[in-house]
């Protein structure tokens, strides 16, 4: 599994409820830009339209060597999932407080582009502070244990 990009802020800003692996419908110039790692998922999110899931605000830069028919960098891209998974995710999208965002993009063993999408719930400020405290405490523990 060749990870292209990972959105590490998701783990800090949200509680992760459930993870899914989804295929992405892309065109050729988008795949070539992905292989060059010219992509940003910081503002990306998943929406549901007509019982299909779409990845919005995923910015894949235009491929420099493509012909005049290059892709739109922020166009919505269809996600490929099983029907059961689509029902589960779309039900959570409709619930208040839940969001679906991409955690990472990667190429699988067959060379296909995949997105790891997660159902998340937003953290409050005190939860974020608690995360920082536990991370610092774990770092300090490992330093002390290495020192002995």
UniProtKB/Swiss-Prot annotation:
Which GO biological process categories is it annotated with?
Answer: trans-translation
Family matches, as SUPFAM superfamilies: Small protein B (SmpB)
> Its Gene Ontology molecular function terms?
RNA binding
Task: Report the subcellular localization.
Answer: Cytoplasm
Q: Which UniProt keywords apply?
A: Cytoplasm, RNA-binding
Q: Where, by residue number, does the polypeptide cross the bilayer?
A: none
What Pfam families does the record point to? SmpB
Query: What Gene Ontology terms describe where this protein resides (cellular component)?
Result: cytosol
Which InterPro entries does the protein's record reference? SmpB, SsrA-bd_prot, SsrA-bd_prot_CS
User: Would you say which domain of life the source belongs to?
Assistant: Bacteria
The UniProt record lists the keyword RNA-binding: yes
This molecule's function is given as:
Required for rescue of stalled ribosomes mediated by trans-translation. Binds to transfer-messenger RNA (tmRNA), required for stable association of tmRNA with ribosomes. tmRNA and SmpB together mimic tRNA shape, replacing the anticodon stem-loop with SmpB. tmRNA is encoded by the ssrA gene; the 2 termini fold to resemble tRNA(Ala) and it encodes a 'tag peptide', a short internal open reading frame. During trans-translation Ala-aminoacylated tmRNA acts like a tRNA, entering the A-site of stalled ribosomes, displacing the stalled mRNA.
Q: Which family does it belong to?
A: Belongs to the SmpB family.
NCBIfam families for this protein: PRK05422.1, smpB
Name of the protein in its database record: SsrA-binding protein
Q: What is the lineage of its organism?
A: Bacteria, Pseudomonadati, Pseudomonadota, Alphaproteobacteria, Rickettsiales
Q: Which gene encodes it?
A: smpB
């Amino acid at each position: 599994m060749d990870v292209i990009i990972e959105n590490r802020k998701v783990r800090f800003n949200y509680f992760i409820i459930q993870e899914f692996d989804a295929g992405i419908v892309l065109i050729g110039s988008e795949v070539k830009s992905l292989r060059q790692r010219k992509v940003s998922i910081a503002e990306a999110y998943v929406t549901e339209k007509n019982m299909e899931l779409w990845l919005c605000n995923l910015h894949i830069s235009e491929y420099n060597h493509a012909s005049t028919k290059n892709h739109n960098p922020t166009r919505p891209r269809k996600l490929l999932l099983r029907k059961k998974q689509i029902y589960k995710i779309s039900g959570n999208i409709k619930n208040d407080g839940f969001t679906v965002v991409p955690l990472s993009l990667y190429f699988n063993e067959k060379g296909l582009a995949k997105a790891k999408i997660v159902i998340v719930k937003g953290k409050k400020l005190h939860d974020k502070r608690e995360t920082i405290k536990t991370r610092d405490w774990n770092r300090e523990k490992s330093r002390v244990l290495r020192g002995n």
